[in-house]
């Protein structure tokens, strides 16, 4: 069956929700509010009760209730004949509805007079019900007074019997609580309409009386209704009293059972603790007592009232907890007011009302089996060991105490103590091998981390080496079909390049290294990462110094050498001479019984290039080059530079594993995450397999060319390793600082007299910076040395100019340009910036500057010789010597020496030179003149005067 909510029923029959709720409660239905739902039959029953004029909860089957209903019907017929007819018509209809339980239907025509009379009767009934509730509350107060020893029941009954009839009185009774004020305000409006209806009814009754209608005794009727209602309320009070007594008894019984359970739990817990105390020793007992939770054995004070009981006591009158009951609320409030002094001592929240319940028993720790092996490290605490072997720290403290070691759970233990402890437990102890996470070199020396099942063949890495302008870049350019050589300044390769080509379905990685003498370190670096070396030699030049150097690098790296004799198309080419010259340095052709392959090529005209590539693949197959692409990537930095928009850019050669974008990486003393990755063609890639050259961005600083790199598990580990490596490098640099001792004291003092040329080097790539700095430091000029104040990659900026001004240095830019702000600041601060693109021109210019830094060297040049013939003494002027030039000439600005008896008695400058009375600049051979010498007046006859000048000589 369908259900209806009470507010829907109220809307259908035109009543308020409150009236419908009260009517449903009076009919014995279990409802709480206007939102409660009832069955269809109960809904019809509620609607029928309003149609029949029922005012109270009348139980079905009660004979007395039927009698009251009959009396109401008779009184209604006697009072109003015409409305009685309508009531009589409604009563059978209501009876029919109760029998068949149909849905109430509104009549087609409304009888307003009958409706007003019905509302007036309902108001009278509600007033009477309110009066009865007031009487009930007074009766409850009397019962409460008797329980507290106040013995006021008889006086209360007397006042109740003497109280006048208040059925039509609008004043509230004194027994209502403060919520009655809201009910009184609502009753005033109802009383106004009731008075108006009463006046209309009185007018109608007068008309009926005049017409001869019988008179009705209202007092007798009201007294009968009141007596019946009082009897019903008395029965309800008796029923509530019995329910309350039963609830008290059940609550007392539950409290006694809870106390018994708590006492039993305490007894069992006490027995358990006594048994454990007897089984263990005193030290273990004390440790266990600190861990175990104590049980609260305090007894609750008897004079403290149970607030939870007081709160629930008023709700045990047969109603729900969330129902409103005027009697129960007043009773609880009075009880609280009477015990206000005791409640002050025990103001606990509602969460503490069940504080006397039995404590939960302490659950025993789950038993765990001991591990078979235990890997420990120095300095582990007792708590850490306990956590690893799944035991209590107190248990380990006890074992250590029995072993003679006093320790707490936070105390560190040495390795011997940990091993003895593990022996006591029967566990095999192993010391943990500490791995230096910052050490990248271990990946290159130990290949135990590689999985043999995942090892596959990789592409060979080939390095092209040779002398300057022997055709290395031209050969690589021919292989890649590009024109790199034309873009290189001066026709020489400035920095290393890495490229990858494909031949016969297989990839080959080529490294191009510079051949200039300044790039020795770059050639050595290229040989260290290569698998095969192609030594290119020009057929017309033969073996050159850098050719021999490349041979030595390849032999030191232990890699096979393939000799490519280039420029065989040129006139004067002599390959046989090249083969014989190489044999002198240990490079013997297979045709001569050696191990080196020789191929005659012409890189310019693409001759025998395929044969060279086939030879490379053949040698690679013999070498069995393998790699594991599944591990984390490791490799070497080929080149590094600082890009204005991208930051630090490093060219890496992957040697093991696969490098991915977003991998955390440590490169030398720097770290970061691979932000972007491009191949040799400038295209973006997401991964790089072994033997693949790529350029990456995302490093915090520019690394050094030749540094190793490794990928770490996460960025946190990579950052820690990078910072540790940078710290170690700084510490090593500080340790290398030379200290002054007695042995090098003279050298230190002598070095203070040596002049220095301060330079700041900025280049496009890191390899060029290294080569340029090394070349400048090798310049040998006596008395002058080069001091590299700062070297870095990238454009010349304002900070470089500021540093140059502070250190009086010259800025040298190699393949870079200064920013506009830096150029403007350099002009303002008078800082010299030299820009170059060819390295040997830089070396020549710096060497000239170093030579110019030395003090000039002077050489004496004799001009002439004169003899004093006569002397003249002039007062206030000095002695004037008359002379004759016997050799050469005497000039005005020349220096002179006075020689007497072959001894130089004075060396100085001329104060004046005259020919007769005229001042002249010089006096020639066999001429006479007069002179005065500054600061010397002791000129005598026959003194010899030598005239000379000091001329600066050029250093070679």
Swiss-Prot record:
GO terms under cellular component: cytosol
Domain of life (superkingdom): Bacteria
Region described as Disordered: spans on this chain: 33-370
Stretches the record annotates as G5: 602-604
Binding site for GTP: 466-473, 512-516, 566-569
Its biological purpose: One of the essential components for the initiation of protein synthesis. Protects formylmethionyl-tRNA from spontaneous hydrolysis and promotes its binding to the 30S ribosomal subunits. Also involved in the hydrolysis of GTP during the formation of the 70S ribosomal complex.
Family statement: Belongs to the TRAFAC class translation factor GTPase superfamily. Classic translation factor GTPase family. IF-2 subfamily.
Protein's name in the database: Translation initiation factor IF-2
Organism from which the protein derives: Streptococcus equi subsp. equi (strain 4047)
